[in-house]
């Protein structure tokens, strides 16, 4: 079935305040390892460069190799692992995020379109309540902007609305789908406010200061472009 419109939504810093999650992890690492905890973030950035997405568990595996696991460090490392696995992601949903998903669903199917690993990112989507809110319509890729043919095959539509905090992604998808796409930019998180991105990409079709602002918008008109 080809829908009139399908809504594609990113997760991190679009529906979920991932910057706060990272801040909480940084504080936990510092509490367990002091200044040495910063080595975790060095591995994190290395992996992001290599893989093209944030790999929190992969960075923890690399950080493990830096430690002497014969002592207390082994217990502290498990503490960090439990912190990540048990993190209350639902507490980091942006205000109105689930309500926006419900509102969009009245006009067309809502689909999560995210980058990430195949373990931690799905868990984040599950535990936050997002998975249930979109009825399991979740796609997680390494580079989602390169998987648009798969998106179209799985969720065929005359038009798409992409809601993403990264102007780079919005621009890349607009280059491929053209007028079939309505790009929506929620100005949330560190990517959205990075001055290096100012004027670098084409202006999104719609810009909102926070995801919850979509509750005040006419979704039918938004989908029509």
Please give the residue ranges for each predicted region.
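Asp-based, Mg2+/Mn2+-dependent phosphohydrolase catalytic module
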Residues: 1-4, 126-162, 166-225
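Generic enzyme active-site microenvironment
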Residues: 8-10, 113, 162-163
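Conserved SAM-binding loop
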Residues: 15, 110, 162
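Active-site neighborhood of HAD-like aspartate-dependent phosphohydrolases
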Residues: 1-43, 65
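Short, surface-exposed alpha-helical segments at coil->helix boundaries
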Residues: 23, 27, 57, 118-122
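Conserved Rossmann-like nucleotide-cofactor binding loop
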Residues: 14, 118-119, 168, 191
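A metal-dependent, Asp-based hydrolase signature
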Residues: 21, 32-35, 45-85
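Substrate-recognition element of Asp-dependent hydrolases with the DxDx(T/V) motif
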Residues: 75-90, 97-128, 138-140
């Amino acid at each position: 079935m080809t829908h009139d419109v399908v809504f594609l939504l990113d997760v991190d810093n679009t529906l979920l305040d991932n910057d706060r999650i990272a801040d909480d992890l940084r504080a936990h690492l510092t509490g367990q390892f002091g200044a040495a905890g910063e080595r975790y973030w060095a591995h994190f950035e290395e992996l992001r460069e290599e893989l093209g997405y944030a790999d929190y568990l992969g960075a923890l595996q690399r950080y493990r190799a830096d430690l002497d696991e014969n002592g207390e460090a082994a217990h502290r490392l498990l503490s960090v692992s439990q912190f990540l696995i048990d993190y209350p992601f639902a507490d980091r949903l942006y205000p109105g995020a689930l309500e926006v998903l419900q509102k969009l669903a009245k006009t067309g199917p809502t689909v999560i379109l995210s980058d990430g690993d195949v373990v931690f990112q799905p868990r984040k989507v599950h535990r936050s309540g997002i998975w249930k809110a979109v009825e399991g319509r979740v796609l997680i890729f390494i580079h989602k902007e390169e998987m648009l043919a798969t998106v179209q095959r799985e969720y065929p539509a005359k038009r798409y609305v992409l809601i993403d905090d990264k102007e780079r992604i919005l621009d890349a998808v607009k280059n491929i789908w053209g007028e079939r796409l309505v790009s929506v930019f929620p100005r949330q998180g560190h990517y959205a406010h990075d001055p290096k991105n100012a004027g670098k990409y084409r202006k999104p079709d719609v810009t909102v200061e926070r995801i919850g602002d979509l509750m005040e918008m006419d979704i039918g008109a938004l989908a029509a472009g």
